[in-house]
């Protein structure tokens, strides 16, 4: 693959910052970031060219082998872990999930640093033919390229840069890549939580936004509520009194839970789907409904689960059987003083050494993240969106990353690992 002429990032940055008081970027890191750019694009092409939907076990096996091989070549101690045995099983959880790649690099220092991303996508087998990897101008397109194959590529080449610099001042540098993120990480969540608790800092490499480049310190938590009502069928015209109307009971349950949202705390619960009956002239024997729940604090999970379990006991029709299932699909990621301090350090690097703006959002927004699992049992900083700037996640024909964001993100990620290892990011 041929690439246009590249100037070293250091030269461009120094020109941009001429006459300012900003610190000059590290010439060695900047030079390596420029050198790694074409190699990272090659890695992206390899990753995108393997279909790896969350339920495509063959594809996930192929891509996990590829990823494992890359980290072995970089000198890591690599494990392929089957997460299925300890899965948190939800209604849509498959019997088996893709393997987790864990690569461990031992250093000479004390700090333990965890880098995470995911290899699975939302796409089904055969869709790659409609959107193969390609580069058009400053955009690299491909299925899953932004969410989250770029994250794998960025981590891979950060590790490569550290190896080339012979940097080993960390105690342990761990890479964790799972294959079930797009289905709420039912298998990998327990491992991610344990690993988060064992490390001094967690950097997650979901992609950043194109128009608003910023790190995420907080995301909303996601839960679901499913109601199943069993009644008794009967003829709606000649003998409705002999039936038990599951739809009536379902409607009652939905209405009595319609006020559980709490704007003051950001808790949201909305009933969004329902199904009942098969014929107009038959009293429905079954009915189901589902609600979407969003929370900003882990403690709100406990509160809303307790509330729905209390409300469901108040039935309209005693003869109906009501079952409720509350599924914690993703916890919220909550901003902490530690994550704010680490984000401020990253912002300083971006501004003073690269001359680029970088936001840090500590207000929860958007979808869930595996970083939230990593933060559940730790007080260490956990930050999301260290990946490339991109757009079109979950889009079958428009998903891309910005090629020009490769060098800055490689520079930032490498500097952050080095500074965390040296204890420079805490304030």
Describe the function of each predicted region:
Residues 24-28, 52, 69-77, 207-212, ...:
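Metal-dependent amide/peptide-bond hydrolase catalytic core
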Residues 144-220, 262, 421, 425-427:
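Acidic/histidine-rich catalytic neighborhood of metal-dependent amide-processing enzymes
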Residues 120-136, 199, 203, 216-228:
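Acidic-glycine-rich active-site phosphate/pyrophosphate-binding loop
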Residues 1-10:
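Bacterial N-terminal signal peptides that target proteins for export
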Residues 24-143, 164, 169:
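Acidic/His- and Gly-rich active-site-bordering loop/insert found
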């Amino acid at each position: 693959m041929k690439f246009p002429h590249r100037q070293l990032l250091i030269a461009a940055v120094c020109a941009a910052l001429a006459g300012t008081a900003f610190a000059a970027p590290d010439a060695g890191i900047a030079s390596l970031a420029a050198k790694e750019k074409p190699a990272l694009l090659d890695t992206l092409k390899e990753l995108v060219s393997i279909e790896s939907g969350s339920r495509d076990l063959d594809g996930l096996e192929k891509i996990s082998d590829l990823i494992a091989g890359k980290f072995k070549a970089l000198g890591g101690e690599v494990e392929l872990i089957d997460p299925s045995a300890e899965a948190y099983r939800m209604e849509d959880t498959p019997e088996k999930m893709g393997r987790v790649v864990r690569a461990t690099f031992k250093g000479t220092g004390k700090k333990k640093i965890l880098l995470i991303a995911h290899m699975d996508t939302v796409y089904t087998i055969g869709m790659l033919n409609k959107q193969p990897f390609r580069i058009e101008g400053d955009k690299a397109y491909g299925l899953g390229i932004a969410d989250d194959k770029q994250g794998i590529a960025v981590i891979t080449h950060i590790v490569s840069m550290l190896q080339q610099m012979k940097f080993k001042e960390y105690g342990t540098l761990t890479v964790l890549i799972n294959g079930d993120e797009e289905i709420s990480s039912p298998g990998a969540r327990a491992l991610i939580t344990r690993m988060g608790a064992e490390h001094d800092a967690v950097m997650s490499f979901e992609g950043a936004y194109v128009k608003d480049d910023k790190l995420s310190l907080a995301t909303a938590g996601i839960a679901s509520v499913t109601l199943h009502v069993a009644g008794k069928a009967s003829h709606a015209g000649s003998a409705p009194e002999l039936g038990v109307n599951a739809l009536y009971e379902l409607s009652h349950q939905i209405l009595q839970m319609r006020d559980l949202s709490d704007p003051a705390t950001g808790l949201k619960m909305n009933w969004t789907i329902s199904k009942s009956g098969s014929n107009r002239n038959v009293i429905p024997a079954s009915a189901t409904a589902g609600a979407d729940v969003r929370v900003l604090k882990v403690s709100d999970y406990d509160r809303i689960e307790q509330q729905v379990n209390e409300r469901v006991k108040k039935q309209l029709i005693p003869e109906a059987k009501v079952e409720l299932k509350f599924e914690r699909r993703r916890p919220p990621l909550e901003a902490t003083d530690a994550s704010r301090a680490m984000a401020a350090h990253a912002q300083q690097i971006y501004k003073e050494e690269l001359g680029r703006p970088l936001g840090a959002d500590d207000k929860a927004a958007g979808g869930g993240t595996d970083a939230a699992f990593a933060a559940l049992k730790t007080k260490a900083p956990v930050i999301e969106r260290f990946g490339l700037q991109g757009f079109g996640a979950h889009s079958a024909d428009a998903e891309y990353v910005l090629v020009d964001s490769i060098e800055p993100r490689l520079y930032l990620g490498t500097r952050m690992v080095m500074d965390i290892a040296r204890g420079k990011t805490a304030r």
